Amino acid sequence: MNLIPTVIEQTSRGERAYDIYSRLLKDRIIILGSPIDDQVANSIVSQLLFLAAEDPEKDISLYINSPGGSITAGLAIYDTMQFIKPDVSTICIGMAASMGAFLLAAGAKGKRFALPNSEIMIHQPLGGAQGQATEIEIAAKRILFLRDKLNRILAENTGQPVEVIERDTDRDNFMTAQKAQEYGIIDRVLTRIDEK
């Protein structure tokens, strides 16, 4: 059962009920709290575009608690974060793994955070192929291309050399929030919201 809390807000015109995500959106907060697929990406992209159109000068906060997911869906979110004018601040709550960690590192420089007990994990893309030898070869070339692209972008966002990223993403690489800060995925570990 998927229960989404409702918030009641008192206004001069009476009461208004919001689902919690709509209420947070009013404060320019977006929650990425699930695996990343096309539907989730479309929702995040829509929220980013809406907030950018509403006020292009005001920061947007993207809270991430995600095990990762689809590369193309994640890149749609990434490209939109870079495309819009407002800075997108990223905050890891819980876990940012795989594409979740990639998006965490893609936040505006100086505005990438994690809470103290968060865990961050980077690795190379996962994939599988079946079918004729030619189809397997095409799939293998594509995943190698995507791996190189993701490594280059992650190197740019962390300040690490591409060779270090290649080595460190060869297998699942789990980090504490402090280690992710040292690595350049985030800028600071937060213990309180007013430290942001």
Curated annotation (Swiss-Prot):
Its EC number is 3.4.21.92. Pfam families: CLP_protease. GO terms for cellular component: cytoplasm; endopeptidase Clp complex. It catalyses: Hydrolysis of proteins to small peptides in the presence of ATP and magnesium. alpha-casein is the usual test substrate. In the absence of ATP, only oligopeptides shorter than five residues are hydrolyzed (such as succinyl-Leu-Tyr-|-NHMec, and Leu-Tyr-Leu-|-Tyr-Trp, in which cleavage of the -Tyr-|-Leu- and -Tyr-|-Trp bonds also occurs). One of its GO terms (biological process) is protein quality control for misfolded or incompletely synthesized proteins. Cleaves peptides in various proteins in a process that requires ATP hydrolysis. Has a chymotrypsin-like activity. Plays a major role in the degradation of misfolded proteins. This is ATP-dependent Clp protease proteolytic subunit. The lineage of its organism: Bacteria, Bacillati, Bacillota, Bacilli, Bacillales.
